[in-house]
Design a protein with these regions (language model features):
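Short, helix-capping/interhelical loops that line the mouth of catalytic, cofactor-
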Residues: 2-15, 63-116
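Short, contiguous alpha-helical
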Residues: 41-80, 130-179
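A glycine-rich beta-turn/hairpin centered on an aromatic-Pro dipeptide
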Residues: 171-199
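An N-terminal domain-cap segment
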Residues: 2-51
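C-terminal interaction segments
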Residues: 2-6, 70, 85, 89, ...
Length: 263
């Protein structure tokens, strides 16, 4: 008899909305404190400068409001946990859209406009609203979970590139960690390896003998930020192991062939 299909993780919609709003606010305040030299630095993401990365983060909120302004789609095609695998082909399109939407205005103005627009749009719609998106139609509730990934990942990018110290909202960090952990389990289903990302997530993955009790024979453990960097291609498996940011035990506890999940 095949194993029962795992029920998708549930997220508290009110907490996710609050986390997205709070993290965007953290970034807006942090960007406002960056000086010209910091804004001119390379972001580490292709040819983008830190200023262009900051503008892209403003576009994340701006595009959410724009999506909610369009007529709704009929039914969702994509869930939150499937979203990481649908993003790679759209990188160029998203970059171009961000440039067109945000060109010509100073960053403080971009953030004020985008934040206000996002707040109005979220107040007007419930989580059941289905957005018509390039990557596939999604409910607003699911799409907001993916916004925690975008915001947390790019906040970390900004901090590293600009030498900033923009805080990560705990609920946003938790949702980002959990979504990317669940995406790993979706990509490599099974129960032979236990991946622990305390204090937010534990998942089992990879086909093979299933662990049932006691200490699992194959364990991977790391912290949330290292996991997020691994899952999004900001660092690689070998480097994380060498720097002791990942602990892996057991002959199957090698995730290098599965990472990054998105880049």
């Amino acid at each position: 008899m095949p194993p029962a299909k795992k029920k998708p993780r549930a997220y508290d919609p009110a907490k996710i909305r609050a986390a997205v709003t709070a993290q965007f606010g953290h970034v807006a305040r942090g960007v406002a404190e960056l000086g010209p030299e910091q804004l001119a630095r390379p972001s580490g993401l292709g040819a983008w400068t830190v200023a262009e990365l900051a503008a892209h983060i403003a576009w994340i909120a701006d595009s959410l409001a724009a999506g909610l302004a369009r007529p709704p789609a009929a039914v969702p095609e994509l869930t939150a946990v499937e979203w990481p695998f649908a993003t790679a082909s759209l990188a160029g399109k998203i970059s171009e859209a961000a440039r067109e939407t945000l060109a010509g205005a100073p960053l403080p103005e971009l953030y004020e406009r985008a934040g206000a627009g996002m707040a109005r749009a979220l107040e007007a719609h419930t989580g059941a609203r289905v957005l018509d998106l390039w990557i596939g139609d999604m409910t607003l509730a699911d799409f907001l979970v993916t916004r925690t990934v975008e915001l947390v990942v790019h906040t970390d990018d900004l901090n590293r590139a600009a030498g900033a110290d923009i805080p990560l909202e705990r609920q946003a960090l938790a949702a980002c960690t959990r979504l990317l952990a669940d995406a790993l389990a979706l990509k490599a289903p099974g129960g032979s390896v236990e991946v622990r990302i305390p204090p937010f997530a534990v998942v089992q993955c990879i086909e093979g003998p299933r662990h049932t009790r006691g200490t699992p024979p194959n364990v991977v453990e790391t912290d949330p930020l290292t996991w997020i960097r691994l899952a999004t291609g900001r660092t690689d498996w070998a480097a994380a192991l060498d720097e002791a940011r990942v602990r892996a035990s057991g002959e199957r506890a090698d995730l290098s062939a599965l990472l990054p999940l998105m880049s």
